[in-house]
Amino acid sequence: MLNFEHKEDEIFFEPLFKELGGLEKNYDLLDLSDALSKREAFNKIRNQVFRELKKQFGDVCMLNYHADCTNTAEQVDHLIPLSSNILNKTIRVMKSERGRKVPAQSFGSNNSRNFVLSCVRCNSAKKHHIPDNKLLNKVLSRNF
């Protein structure tokens, strides 16, 4: 069981995974531990993950998120971002202070199910956004 810092974050994630067996069956996509540590660990395996995903899925952008998607696998991305300030902005309506960004929270994991191939455009467009249930369903069902 995950211990979300805020109950409303758990409430936010529940409907995203409803069609995928529920939140509990998808805990492997989430890791609430320190984002910097997760990023350092990912950087050590990034190239290997990229090769394995290309071998398994081919040279395809699994996100198809940007209107001008090139549909080529150029990068590895996290489906659920390692960290994001989206919920702090939208749910808690936090504002940035004097040139500082709204604080980010740690969410995504380095589990293989959370890795996707993407083109540069889609990866750049998605940034730290948490995908909606339609994109989650498409990618996790490997229907791209």
Where in the sequence are the language-model features?
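C-terminal/domain-terminus segments
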Residues: L2-F13, K127-F144
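Hydrophobic beta-strand residues in large extracellular and virion-surface proteins
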Residues: V49, C61, V76, F115-L117, ...
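Hydrophobic/aromatic-lined pockets within catalytic cores
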Residues: K54, I80, S84, N123-K127
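Histidine-centered nuclease catalytic patch
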Residues: H66-L117, I130
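Cys/His-rich metal-chelating microdomains
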Residues: V60, N64-T72, R121-A125
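Intrinsically disordered, low-complexity peptide-like regions
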Residues: M1-K7, V76, R121
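Compositionally biased, intrinsically disordered low-complexity segments
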Residues: K7, E14-L16, Q48, E52, ...
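Short, charged surface segments at domain edges that flank catalytic/cofactor-binding sites
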Residues: F13-Y65, S96-S109, R113
